[in-house]
Amino acid sequence: MAVNFPSIDPAQLHPVAGVTLGWAEANIRKPNRKDVLVISVDESATVAGVFTENRFCAAPVIVCREHLAKVRAGGAGIRALVVNTGNANAGTGEPGLVNARETCAELARLAGIEPAQVLPFSTGVILEPLPIDRLKAGLPAALANRKAANWFDAAQAIMTTDTLPKATSRQVTIDGHTVTLTGISKGAGMIKPNMATMLGFLAFDANVAQPVLDTLVKEVADRSFNCITIDGDTSTNDSFILIASGKSTLPAITSTDSPAYAALRDAVTEVAQVLSQLIVRDGEGATKFMTVQVEGGKSVAECRQIAYAIGHSPLVKTAFYASDPNLGRILAAIGYAGVADLDVDKIDLYLDDVLVAKAGGRNPAYQEEDGQRVMKQSEITIRVQLGRGDAQATIWTCDLSHDYVSINADYRS
């Protein structure tokens, strides 16, 4: 029940020079579906990532962090990524780590690279052993299937409860040079800031030094995947990866102070925001896409704190599902967000262009039918003005429906 989900034409997903993708059906959890993905990158590439902040992080997340640390310490660069769906390899203890490392070793053997040059990713059911033999058996087919144009198939290969594959692509001009950016993502539940059950892979052909890419991935994640919430749960497996293949004619970006870096950051952020918003639009059972804007704060942090209190609230989300203008729930969420010195008498609340609350109380001119008119729309903006500064923050969320319960109750059946 995706909300205004754009039609994705596979032909419009630009290949990124130096990146190939292959998939296989390995029967990890269900038969006859793509469930293994291999992404290969040329030696010229640099790779960086950010991962879940869940302390119960999955085995592949641990291994990814280890392998990227070796790259930063001067080791050989990352040459391949491998993803399986249907099983999260989380809550699996030492055997899970063994399986994640064995996956890397097997792919490295087949591809003629080192195990530490492979990053593993898993998504699916937690607390179940990874069927390592099936995963390994699928790797040769995925390698043989690699093509530069396989982005749409790759998006399909990483889906779990997603109803639609998520992908987008751009070409931009930086200092007179064309840069191609293409990315895929997955996720429909267990989504909140600081990553969630979400995978995102975004490649572009610019040449970016490793320390610069490490900064870029954090800045981009903070403006995109860390600005979405569906149900407030944070998963064990979430990962967001940037791949800079180095094949563009754009001169190498070696400093975050350069104009080229700023232009690239803006382009990558735009693509990442589309990928993250597609996750919200395909949120489990979602019928409405909501933008929460908090303005006039003392800091971005407090604006986000309030925005997430609104976006996480089951009472707010169910009110929007029902188109019920019980909008005191939003004020309550603002109040419990934890901003200690908030002056509620300065707060204004808008639904789109409708002023609901003014100076901390109901706007005398507000009519409930005006609020309901907005809430019946499929796309809604909740705007809060705090009246205490110039900072602002925006997040994206969705409503909470009966179908959300059904999807998650039936997930393992």
Swiss-Prot record:
Q: Which reaction does it catalyse?
A: N(2)-acetyl-L-ornithine + L-glutamate = N-acetyl-L-glutamate + L-ornithine; L-glutamate + acetyl-CoA = N-acetyl-L-glutamate + CoA + H(+)
- Give any GO molecular function from the UniProt entry: glutamate N-acetyltransferase activity
> Enzyme group, top EC level?
transferase
Q: What EC identifiers does the entry list?
A: 2.3.1.35, 2.3.1.1
Query: Does the record bear Transferase in its keywords?
Result: yes
In the UniProt record, which is one GO cellular component term? Answer: cytoplasm
Q: Say if the entry is tagged with keyword Transmembrane helix.
A: no
**In which pathway does this enzyme or protein participate?**
Amino-acid biosynthesis; L-arginine biosynthesis; L-ornithine and N-acetyl-L-glutamate from L-glutamate and N(2)-acetyl-L-ornithine (cyclic): step 1/1; Amino-acid biosynthesis; L-arginine biosynthesis; N(2)-acetyl-L-ornithine from L-glutamate: step 1/4
Its domain of life reads Bacteria
Q: Where in the cell is it found?
A: Cytoplasm
Q: What family is reported?
A: Belongs to the ArgJ family.
Q: What does this protein do?
A: Catalyzes two activities which are involved in the cyclic version of arginine biosynthesis: the synthesis of N-acetylglutamate from glutamate and acetyl-CoA as the acetyl donor, and of ornithine by transacetylation between N(2)-acetylornithine and glutamate.
Q: What is this protein's name?
A: Arginine biosynthesis bifunctional protein ArgJ
Which organism is this entry from?
Answer: Burkholderia lata (strain ATCC 17760 / DSM 23089 / LMG 22485 / NCIMB 9086 / R18194 / 383)
Q: What is the lineage of its organism?
A: Bacteria, Pseudomonadati, Pseudomonadota, Betaproteobacteria, Burkholderiales
